[in-house]
């Protein structure tokens, strides 16, 4: 039987939500009721499958940790008042911390003036953000297209490369095994995990994947394309594969890829959606090798954890294919004043507080500690690796990795696995995480591994 729409029900539900938004605190009964509602609504209206992947939901589904507010720059508080150290960072969006006051203030001030742009009058913050990114990014990157997410920034990059290279008779893209570039149809064609790809086959033609970090395989793909007339339009890469398990290529790999692109007339697209904005100890990970891409993709932390925003930045030569018809690729909400205000404030905080350098220093502290734990628990931990505050702990199997994440949750530390490598747990906290909290995270990790070791020995 078809369900009839109910304006009364929708009105009551929205009014209830607005009442919750206004509240600063909840009493015990309100907390219990909200937990039940959220779990029920996820089951019935969002996706019940999500609950199976949440460490914060008990097996019986009778309790779930429902987030309520940021506790500080580096912590989250649930409806029960429990405070968690955030070592997940919303998959890398909270580089400047939770509710950073500079970012929040910028958005609030803009909200009081003009939340969204008219689409006809020129919006100043879009222009100022584009100018700021031109100054901040490496090489000849000059023009920016703004959107709402990392996937959208990759879609724009692929379309831009196609528009530039199609008149030159080049149509093929090289991506890499283990890559993650998003899940929309174009970005998914570059993504390499079969679980995400197979239900939507066939994807866009013209994509081939080579092993990440293997410059010989990359060179062969270029050479074969030249021989067969299937010439390469662009290479799309993450400088460090995030969802692939925080996989670092050999030193000099990006430099050699850049040389191949120059030799064969291909564009180099760097997807820094996760590695950008100071995460790896430099503002952009490509700066570790002084490599300059033709197109750069940003998102996640660009909005300061307050507003969603993505950016595709390109050289004038490449971006000029959109000059005659700027409507070839547009988005209604991309580059809106609130998002641009957040991005400008985020960049200001990153530079004023020198957070990339802090990420390098504190990342070394964390990585040294995790490597020590790997030596102490070799039957549980296979490897610890990373750069800056993008760190991975690889366990011996998927179940051990999931158990570690659950134990860390009990220690009130949020971590999670990577999408393409389930046995790898990422440590991706705000760059504002204090040294004291870094030490607490390492202590919690030691406690978690000790508890896991006891379970292994009992078996």
Curated annotation (Swiss-Prot):
Gene3D superfamilies: Aspartate Aminotransferase, domain 1, Type I PLP-dependent aspartate aminotransferase-like (Major domain). It is an enzyme of class 2 (transferase). It catalyses: an alkane-alpha,omega-diamine + 2-oxoglutarate = an omega-aminoaldehyde + L-glutamate; putrescine + 2-oxoglutarate = 1-pyrroline + L-glutamate + H2O; cadaverine + 2-oxoglutarate = 5-aminopentanal + L-glutamate. The modification N6-(pyridoxal phosphate)lysine is found at residue 300. It comes from the Bacteria. Pathway: Amine and polyamine degradation; putrescine degradation; 4-aminobutanal from putrescine (transaminase route): step 1/1. One of its GO terms (molecular function) is identical protein binding. InterPro entries: Aminotrans_3 (IPR005814), Aminotrans_3_PPA_site (IPR049704), Class-III_PLP-dep_AT (IPR050103), Putrescine_aminotransferase (IPR017747), PyrdxlP-dep_Trfase (IPR015424), PyrdxlP-dep_Trfase_major (IPR015421), PyrdxlP-dep_Trfase_small (IPR015422). Keywords: Aminotransferase, Pyridoxal phosphate, Transferase. Its EC number is 2.6.1.82, 2.6.1.29. CDD domains: OAT_like (cd00610). Its cofactor is pyridoxal 5'-phosphate. The keyword Repressor does not apply. One of its GO terms (biological process) is putrescine catabolic process. Pyridoxal 5'-phosphate binds at residues 150-151, 274, 332. Catalyzes the aminotransferase reaction from putrescine to 2-oxoglutarate, leading to glutamate and 4-aminobutanal, which spontaneously cyclizes to form 1-pyrroline. This is the first step in one of two pathways for putrescine degradation, where putrescine is converted into 4-aminobutanoate (gamma-aminobutyrate or GABA) via 4-aminobutanal. Also functions as a cadaverine transaminase in a a L-lysine degradation pathway to succinate that proceeds via cadaverine, glutarate and L-2-hydroxyglutarate. PANTHER family: AMINOTRANSFERASE CLASS III (PTHR11986), PUTRESCINE AMINOTRANSFERASE (PTHR11986:SF112). Belongs to the class-III pyridoxal-phosphate-dependent aminotransferase family. Putrescine aminotransferase subfamily. This is Putrescine aminotransferase. It comes from Salmonella dublin (strain CT_02021853). The lineage of its organism: Bacteria, Pseudomonadati, Pseudomonadota, Gammaproteobacteria, Enterobacterales.
């Amino acid at each position: 039987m078809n369900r009839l729409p109910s304006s009364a029900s929708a009105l009551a539900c929205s009014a209830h939500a607005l009442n919750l938004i206004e509240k600063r605190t909840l009493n015990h009964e309100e907390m219990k009721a909200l937990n039940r509602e959220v779990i029920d609504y996820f089951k019935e209206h969002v996706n019940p499958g999500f609950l199976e992947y949440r460490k914060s939901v008990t097996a019986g589904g009778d309790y779930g940790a429902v987030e309520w507010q940021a506790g500080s720059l580096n912590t989250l508080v649930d409806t029960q008042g429990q405070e968690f150290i955030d070592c997940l960072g919303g998959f890398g969006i909270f580089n400047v911390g939770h509710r950073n006051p500079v970012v929040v203030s910028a958005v609030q001030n803009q909200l009081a003036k003009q939340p969204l742009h008219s689409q006809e009058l020129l919006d100043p913050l879009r222009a100022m953000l584009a100018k700021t990114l031109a100054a901040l990014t490496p090489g000849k990157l000059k023009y920016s297209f703004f959107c709402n997410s990392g996937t959208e920034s990759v879609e724009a990059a692929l379309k831009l490369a196609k528009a530039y290279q199609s008149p030159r008779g080049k149509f093929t893209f090289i991506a890499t095994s283990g890559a993650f570039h998003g899940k929309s149809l174009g970005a998914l064609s570059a993504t390499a995990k079969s679980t995400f790809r197979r239900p939507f086959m066939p994807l866009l033609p013209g994509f081939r994947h080579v092993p990440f970090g293997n410059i010989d395989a990359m060179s062969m793909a270029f050479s074969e394309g030249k021989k067969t007339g299937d010439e390469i339009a662009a290479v799309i890469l993450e400088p460090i594969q995030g969802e692939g398990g925080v996989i670092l290529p050999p030193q000099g790999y990006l430099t050699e890829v850049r040389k191949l692109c120059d030799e064969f007339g291909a564009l180099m697209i760097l997807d820094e959606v996760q590695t950008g904005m100071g995460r790896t100890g430099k503002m952009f990970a490509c700066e570790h090798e002084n490599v300059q891409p033709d197109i750069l993709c940003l998102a996640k932390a660009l909005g300061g954890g307050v507003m969603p925003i993505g950016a595709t930045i390109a050289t004038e030569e490449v971006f000029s294919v959109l000059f005659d018809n700027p409507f070839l690729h547009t988005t209604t909400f991309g580059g809106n004043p609130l998002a641009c205000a957040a991005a400008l404030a985020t960049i200001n905080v990153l530079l004023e507080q020198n957070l990339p350098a802090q990420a390098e220093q504190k990342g070394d502290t964390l990585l040294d500690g995790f490597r020590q734990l790997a030596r102490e628990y070799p039957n549980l931990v296979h490897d610890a690796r990373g750069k800056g505050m993008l760190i991975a702990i690889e366990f011996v199997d998927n179940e051990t990795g999931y158990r570690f994440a659950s134990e860390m949750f009990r220690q009130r530390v949020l971590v999670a696995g990577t999408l393409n490598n389930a046995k790898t747990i990422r440590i991706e906290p705000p760059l504002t995480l204090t040294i004291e909290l870094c030490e607490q995270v390492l202590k919690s990790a030691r406690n978690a591994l000790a508890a896991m070791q006891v379970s292994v020995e009992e078996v």
